[in-house]
């Protein structure tokens, strides 16, 4: 399926399909949501994630985002929104079930190398894959023109393909193998396991 965001413009019918699609998929999640997005600042999405975490005790959410915004305006907009998003989504939820993270590598000396995330992707329980142009930000949901693709798995091979894509991305961010990521995700404390997997001079996840 395709979901669009079309802002209010003269002689153009507006659309907020992306916003509604994201909320619907979050409310359908039961086990694991993986989000990879340049921005994580839309409070409505944070509230939906928090509500679903409280409704589904087995659900876990892992967000991988950028940690080093570029330019004065991006910095000002980014940090306030990220802090609010984090506070909302974590409210009343055990910390081992939700993490807002970034990927970085620490060389032997010098500053950490922070990976700049520009992708916009979400997986839901190996059942849904969303990939497109939409950031999890107020601007992207209302003012920009966006288009996202939604893939729904209706067979085991399709579910396996979505899981493989997610695990491949996590392997890149943690410097683990795909097989190692798969084993960690089967553990009860899987998010903590991914954050604790650190190697010298290689990329790993941190809060």
Locate predicted features:
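Charged, low-complexity intrinsically disordered terminal segments
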Residues: 1-207
């Amino acid at each position: 399926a395709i979901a669009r965001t079309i802002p209010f413009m003269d002689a153009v019918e507006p659309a907020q399909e992306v916003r509604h699609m994201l909320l619907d998929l979050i409310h359908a999640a039961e086990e694991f949501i993986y989000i990879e997005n340049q921005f994580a600042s839309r409070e409505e999405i944070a509230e939906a994630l928090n509500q679903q975490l409280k409704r589904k005790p087995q659900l876990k959410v892992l967000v991988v985002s950028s940690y080093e915004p570029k330019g004065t305006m991006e910095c000002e907009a980014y940090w306030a929104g990220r802090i609010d998003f984090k506070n909302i989504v974590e409210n009343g939820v055990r910390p081992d079930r939700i993490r807002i993270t970034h990927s970085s590598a620490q060389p032997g000396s010098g500053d950490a190398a922070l990976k700049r995330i520009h992708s916009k992707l979400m997986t839901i329980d190996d059942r849904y894959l969303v990939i497109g142009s939409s950031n999890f930000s107020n601007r992207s949901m209302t003012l920009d023109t966006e288009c996202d693709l939604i893939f729904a798995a209706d067979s085991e091979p399709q579910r396996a393909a979505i899981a493989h894509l997610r695990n491949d991305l996590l392997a890149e961010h943690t410097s683990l193998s795909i097989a190692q990521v798969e084993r960690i995700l089967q553990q009860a404390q899987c998010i903590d396991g991914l954050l604790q997997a650190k190697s010298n001079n290689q990329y790993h996840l941190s809060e």
